[in-house]
Regions:
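Structural detector for internal amphipathic alpha-helices that build alpha-solenoid repeat scaffolds
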Residues: 2-21, 31-54, 65, 75-89, ...
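Amphipathic alpha-helical scaffolding segments comprising HEAT/armadillo-like alpha-solenoid repeats
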Residues: 19-32, 53-68, 89-103, 125-137
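Structural signature of alpha-solenoid helical repeat scaffolds
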Residues: 36, 68-72, 104-108, 137, ...
């Protein structure tokens, strides 16, 4: 019995049997990204980040929306910030820079803010330099945080 061989491959499968992220349907991933189970959420965000890295603007846009949806969940925000590094768009840079201003540094938030800075460090310099320089010159941040902003600009 040949099963579904007459039906052919789905349009998002390549001839080599690989998934073409530029054609993969996104609906099920969007639902998974708001799943209460952390493992499901994380898997969806990683896939959205991969899709954004191959030019799927809608995947990056959804990640931006998740920043607001999970605004008080640092564990999930860390995953979202990590994946936004794969969305080289001005909106991603602006959202990550805004997170640094929104979330005050403390022992509880330090890990998340460090993740935001690591994501900013891999985005194209022309998207982040002026924002990071402005943060580095802002005396409302501690000298330690300002040094981190300068170090990120220098990368």
């Amino acid at each position: 019995m040949k099963g579904n061989s007459k039906l052919g491959s789905p349009p998002w499968m390549t001839a080599e049997g690989m998934v073409d992220l530029t054609k993969l349907p996104i609906d099920f991933i969007l639902k998974q990204a708001i799943d209460p189970e952390y493992k499901e959420f994380r898997s969806a965000c990683v896939l959205l980040g991969s899709m954004a890295s191959v030019g799927r603007l809608e995947a990056g846009l959804y990640l931006l929306g998740l920043l607001g949806w999970y605004a008080s969940d640092l564990q999930r925000l860390e995953v979202i910030a990590e994946q936004l590094a794969h969305s080289p768009h001005g909106s991603s840079a602006n959202a990550l820079l805004a997170e640094i201003r929104r979330v005050r540094s403390s022992n509880t938030t330090r890990r998340y803010l460090d993740r935001v800075l690591r994501s900013l460090a891999v985005l194209p310099p022309h998207l982040v330099e002026s924002g990071l320089e402005a943060l580095a010159e802002d005396t409302s941040f501690s000298p330690k945080m300002r040094a981190k902003f300068f170090a990120t600009v220098a990368r």
